[in-house]
């Protein structure tokens, strides 16, 4: 979890920017979106396979 201590003479915008950078660096939001709802293993495999096919098709262009 990202933790930000607001420094002396630091604006709230700067502190918020540091917090957002920390959250994105930790991958907190990605983890939240991944666990937002349960995905059955079979569906997860299918999505992963489709993403790989799409990637390969895009790479072949």
UniProtKB/Swiss-Prot annotation:
PROSITE patterns: RIBOSOMAL_S21 (PS01181)
Molecular functions (GO terms): structural constituent of ribosome
One Pfam family named in its UniProt record: Ribosomal_S21
Keyword Oxidoreductase: no
Domain of life from the UniProt record: Bacteria
GO term, biological process aspect, one: translation
Keywords (A to Z) from UniProt: Ribonucleoprotein, Ribosomal protein
This protein's GO CC annotations: ribonucleoprotein complex; ribosome
Similarity comment: Belongs to the bacterial ribosomal protein bS21 family.
NCBIfam families per UniProt: S21p
Name listed for the protein in its UniProt record: Small ribosomal subunit protein bS21
Organism encoding this protein: Leuconostoc mesenteroides subsp. mesenteroides (strain ATCC 8293 / DSM 20343 / BCRC 11652 / CCM 1803 / JCM 6124 / NCDO 523 / NBRC 100496 / NCIMB 8023 / NCTC 12954 / NRRL B-1118 / 37Y)
């Amino acid at each position: 979890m990202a933790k930000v201590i607001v420094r002396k003479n630091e604006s709230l915008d700067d502190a918020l920017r540091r917090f957002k950078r920390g959250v994105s660096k930790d991958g907190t939001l990605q983890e939240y979106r991944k666990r937002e709802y349960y995905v059955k293993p079979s569906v997860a495999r299918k999505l992963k396979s489709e993403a790989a096919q799409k990637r390969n098709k895009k790479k072949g262009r």
